Amino acid sequence: MKLTFRIEYRTAWGEELGVILDGNNSEPIILRTPNGEHWEGEAEMPDLPACVPVSYRYGVYRDGQCIRRESGTMAHLFCPGKKKNCHYISNDFWKDLPAESYLYSSAFSGDYQSETTIKVTASADGSITFRALCPCLHHKRQVLAISGDCPALGNWDIQKTVLMEEIQPNEWTITLNVSTLEFPLSYKFVACNADSKQVEEWENHDNRMLNNPELKKGEIYLTPETEVHFTSSARKVAGTAIPVFSLRSEKSFGVGDFGDLKKLIDWAAKTHQQAVQILPINDTTITHTWMDSYPYNSISIYAFHPMYIDLNQLGKMKDKEALAVFEARRQELNALPQIDYEAVNNAKRSYLKVMFQQTGRKVLASAEFKKFFEENEHWLLPYAAFSYLRDLYGTPDFSQWPEHTEYKAEEIAALCAPDSSCYEEIAFYYYTQYHLHIQLLDAGNYAREKGIIFKGDIPIGISRNSVEAWIEPYYFNMNGQAGAPPDAFSVNGQNWGFPTYNWEVMEQDNYQWWQKRFRKMAEYFTAYRIDHILGFFRIWEIPSHSVHGLLGQFVPALPMSVDEIQSYGLPFQKDFMTKPFINEEMLNKMFGDKAAFVKETFVQHAHDDIYEMRPEYDTQRKVEAYFSDKKDEESIHIREGVYALISNVLFVPDRKHPSMYHPRIAVQNDFIFGRLDWKEKDAFNRLYNHYYYQRHNQFWYQEAMKKLPILTQATSMLVCGEDLGMVPDCVPWVMDQLQILSLEIQRMPKNPKHEFGHVWEYPYRSVCTISTHDMSTLRGWWEEDYEQTCRYYNHVMGHWGEVPVSAPGWVCEEIVRHHLECPSLLCILSFQDWLSIDEEIRYPDVNTERINVPANPRHYWKYRMHLTLEELIKNKKFNEKLVEMIDTTGRF
């Protein structure tokens, strides 16, 4: 079998084009060119299997190294026939991201497997294979066909169209005898009903033309893979967002588990939803207390939290007395209105220990487990060792361990060896993770079978006391803390405590750390949310000595020199502008009758009415330590005030170049800004606005484009970005270029001139929602600010008269319907907001429905749905209402 590749691509001097066949580890097929633009090359491929799609990609090479390759997870395709002496001539265009790349994702394409053998018949006179890319068809409801101006293509008769075959998701092909065609050939693609085969729509394109390729005997001409679009086929989907821990079923053990996901998927399918979104599910076990309930502080980017295991799938416990005790405990915990994190985890861990003793050896000896271990050993072994050592030494802080503070693979391999004295304790973690893996895999496959997009969540950070920080410290900056500048969630900014990434080191191996993480996630999910996508442009890095986020700076960034600061007309005074400004008036105003105590304890007199921090309390961490055992309201007020003293500066020194500076974020609200005269304020504001909103756009664009194209194309999952907060102009540039779905929330409009977003103006390539886990629910928000609610009721909903203090069901239904009607591709609403439309089943206590309060770093994540999934599935009235709303808004 001979292959000829032809492509037009303009190269620079010294560059050449090559072709790599996927799955073929041989050297690239280097093409020839007469002019640096038209390239052609041949290869003999006698061993290619018949009737099986063959994929290949083009790349640009210089000095034998590939310097650029085609974008995306999509390759060129053709399907060889059974005849071995054929000559395939492929005519191609270079493939960058297709116009609707998100529709080619596994979220919409699924894991396609052809149900029949692909038929490719090559005629003696030569054949033409028409190739088309079409992501717009409704999966399993429509097929692609071709119609044209000759008898072989039906002479434009819609009853005689020629059906094509889908050889890969969205990739359609048909091979016709060249002698049956008439040239020049005019043709178009059409969408047909999969059952009746009747034409439902013609493609939105002029007639396509094909001249006679003048083929020789045995030659098969492959047309370029052209994109096909239809006007009326814009997909729109509705879905539900809910954490796994919040699920409740009749058989769950006080917390949602992976088994409950299948019931959630059943309910979603029953109500014509096509998406289910969850929060991160990785192991966060650090202290074995409720503090570990925060799902974004994982100790492993691969291991799942043991509390999500469905104990019912482990088999029957032989010890009947123990089983009875566990069943009583299960019923007790499952009856609680919220999660008792510590009780649930202790009980489920004890249950797992019993089952490990009963079935562990058999499971670990199975072929299925051995395959799992072989494929996951690179993370599973260090995770198990870390978990064992964490409990052995009573701390997750590996720098405090008496042994193994520095990860050495040989030592850890010996610790985890089957002949090790602690092997059984290590193997317990293998056993647990194996069952979690097969249960989540089962849930993910079930979602695919049901046509449900299964959307996961990629946290931006990791715990500084984590497996990855232990075994791969070179990937992280451990001397800083990741967070976010002040926003609607927190006036002092957010300090997540995560180490920041060492992107320079990650770039050296093409971001393999991230690519492996995404590929692992793709085993289970078909879509994912990039938590805080802004972190791939720049991260808000807070000094390790800070508690609040106000003293942070963007990394990477372009700090300002003293000369540049002064060029704005602002005379630079280092001590006044970079050290905490504290005077008598400020102390009295902030602390009132406690000002004397603050003077005696935390500050000391400098000169005139000016004070400075005492050395023993000159950082927020030192102050935090002083108040560690003081929890009364007055102490907390003083502590927060002293924090504010320390952050009362106009400029923050750059972390690497201390003679250069960053304007302190949101300083216009602090005392020091009030000390400036009007000219200085004007100069500072001009400097500030340029620095935060203009200076870095190109710089951060380039930073993001180093990383995100590689990461988003590492898998076929649908990519959604959480682009909230302080969003620079370059973020939508990158998201548009890479076709990443944005997040649209009406109460957090992207247009700063609007109080509320206009849902009808949302971009198609977006996810719209009413509230996220970091926000109050729809009903909770309605009750927060009555004046704002009135404006929304009048100006957005168009209603007048008395505004209800609490949102009645009809108000919630109207708001939900407006969101379903918006142009967004995905409308994924929180479970609580779906329930808000029905006053009979929604939970009476609005406040308990909130999942997280970002301003509180010690928030207890314990929300749980108040009714069971079984009850939800049986609620005919509510479910029929959802079906009506979803169907009439075109989302099914």
Descriptions of predicted regions:
Residues 100-123, 127-129, 177, 211-892:
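Catalytic cores of glycan-processing enzymes that make or break glycosidic bonds
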Residues 50-51, 72, 78, 160, ...:
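Short amphipathic alpha-helical leader/targeting segments
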Residues 31-33, 87, 163-165, 195, ...:
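Intrinsically disordered, low-complexity regions enriched in Ser/Pro/Gly/Gln/His and often acidic
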Residues 52-54, 811:
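Glycine-rich, flexible loop segments associated with nucleotide phosphate handling
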Residues 2-52, 61-82, 133-183, 192-215, ...:
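Aromatic-rich carbohydrate-binding modules that target alpha-glucans
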Residues 97:
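Extracellular carbohydrate recognition and processing domains
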Residues 77, 81, 85-93:
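C2-type phospholipid-binding modules
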